[in-house]
Amino acid sequence: IRLKKDRFELDELARAVAVTKAGFDDIIRALPRAVGHRRGERVIEGAFRAVAREEGNGEGYETIAASGNHANTLHWIDNDGEVREGDLVLVDAGVEVDSLYTADITRTLPVNGRFTEVQARVYQAVLDACEAALARANQPGCRFKDVHDAAMGVIAARLHEWGILPVTPEESLASEGQQHRRWMPHGTSHHLGLDVHDCAKARSELYQGALLEPGMVFTIEPGLYFRADDMLIPEEYRGIGVRIEDDVVVNSDGSVTRISEDIPRTVADVEAWIARVQAG
């Protein structure tokens, strides 16, 4: 029953996403203060928590506010690091509304408002993976696991283009390969609802192997993670971690659309968003 949401549930999830957007706006307002604080990541976490508590029941899960190399720790929840000019900050956060339905959104923001060339290159690769996953979800006969496979096709191709992947994309994508998973080690999607990882214990044939059906709500969240101490990659990539996560719904006609479409995510739109919010 929980795998497919009814109208009430869909409305609550949309409300959770809308309040989460407000929380991200306050994160952007807090970025200058975060830069000057010895625990700037907690300034970001606190800004989001205030909105979650004031406008909802609270945070749907522990906020990840990961600046710089901390973004390369997938569930960085200590949030005790500095936030430095020129770095990216990866924020994975969601508001749980009073009905207990939660959003789950990730945005990777340039702390000073502008991406560097290499940051934008990595970011665009992740965004392209998001778009490929959404496009596959909109094709007839798509199974849940196909969404991940589509995203990984882009990730493997970009890693190969940059000279990072030690094999061809086809070899990496084969079950006996998977070399790309060094830099993208997690799944692309999970169901969303009362739990941030909704229906996590569902049988495989009802989850990964299931056809997408109207009422399903899930995330699309590929990433690329280049640790600062990774000697297998060019130096310019080291310390950069990017994830982009949206919440999507399968509509009654079978199309899949982003519930979180109002939260900017392209390079240009993110930069404009930061400038607009900080201008007041």
Regions found by a protein language model. Give the residues of each.
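Active-site neighborhoods and metal-handling regions in enzymes and metal-associated proteins
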Residues: 1-280
